[in-house]
């Protein structure tokens, strides 16, 4: 199964210029299921629902905002929930979907944690993690834009390396990009590349490239074989002078066995 996450950068001044690139990247990566962040209602209806070649898809808009989260899937989505509509889950900017493949039940959660508050990120990931540990599924997938790098408090909490507000992730989660990079003897490549991405061209940015976009799997006794993890959306198109987004997408190929 190919699973992917992609923040498509809802920047009004360049979005229509990049629209074809975004759709082409999504079609080319050909994931079985992909979570998208920074999706406007207009872009979802105009491009994703009609041009991305997915029969099953869903969009959930944040209350009072013009953007939200989307999931595109080769499999029927049998249950959907917006956690930002649930006060008991910290109104977390996350959407949860269930789907079945060959009798195996999957829970997939797509998140876009707040960029402007580490405290809010911590409270939201605690709520999301608690929600997912309350579910019954054969495999849990957590993906999205975490707005924090590897080694951040959110990442360390998910990986079982620290507590947050007296709570722990048990069982913990595994970051697929880190696992695959370790096997290959390589460093994990940044997904928010403030050095090479044209968004920051000529700006002499003070920001350091970070691995903000990640895919985690919850620890399970069931068998998981990680085949590959790659970035996509990294190429600059001459016509626009941009890559498709200011974030690079992450795609993982995983074999699941119950």
Summary of predicted features, one role per range:
Residues 2-8, 22-44, 72, 108-111, ...:
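Active-site beta-strand/loop signature of hydrolases that rely on acidic residues for catalysis
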Residues 15, 27, 33-113, 228-230:
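Structured beta-strand-rich core segments of catalytic domains in phosphoester-bond hydrolases
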Residues 18, 46-47, 68, 120-124, ...:
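Residues at alpha-helix caps and immediate loop-helix transition turns in enzyme cores, especially N-
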Residues 20-22, 50-53, 88-89, 125-127, ...:
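Glycine-rich, phosphate-binding/catalytic loops in enzymes
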Residues 112-128, 149-162:
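Active-site-proximal segments of metal-dependent phosphoesterases and phosphodiesterases across multiple
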């Amino acid at each position: 199964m190919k699973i992917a996450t992609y923040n498509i950068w809802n920047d009004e001044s360049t979005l229509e210029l990049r629209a074809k690139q975004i759709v082409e990247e999504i079609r080319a990566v050909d994931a079985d299921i992909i979570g998208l962040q920074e999706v406007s209602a207009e872009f979802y209806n105009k491009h994703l629902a009609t041009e991305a070649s997915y029969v099953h898809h869903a969009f959930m808009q944040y209350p009072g905002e013009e953007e939200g989260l989307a999931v595109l899937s080769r499999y029927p989505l049998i249950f959907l929930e917006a956690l930002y509509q649930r006060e008991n889950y910290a109104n977390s900017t996350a959407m949860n979907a269930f789907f079945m493949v060959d009798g195996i039940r999957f829970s997939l959660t797509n998140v876009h944690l707040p960029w402007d508050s580490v405290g809010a990120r911590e409270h939201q990931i605690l709520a999301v993690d608690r929600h997912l540990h309350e579910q019954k599924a054969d495999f849990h997938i957590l993906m999205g834009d975490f707005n924090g790098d590897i080694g951040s408090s959110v990442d360390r909490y998910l990986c079982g390396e620290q507590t947050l507000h007296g709570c722990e992730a048990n069982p913990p989660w595994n970051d697929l990009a880190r696992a695959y990079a370790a096997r290959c003897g390589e460093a994990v490549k940044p997904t928010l590349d403030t050095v090479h991405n044209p968004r920051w061209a000529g700006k002499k940015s003070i920001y350091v490239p970070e691995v903000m976009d990640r895919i985690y799997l919850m620890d399970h006794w069931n068998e998981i074989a990680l085949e590959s993890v790659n970035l996509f959306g990294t190429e600059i198109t001459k016509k626009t002078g941009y890559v498709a987004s200011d974030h690079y997408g992450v795609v993982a190929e995983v074999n699941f066995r119950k």
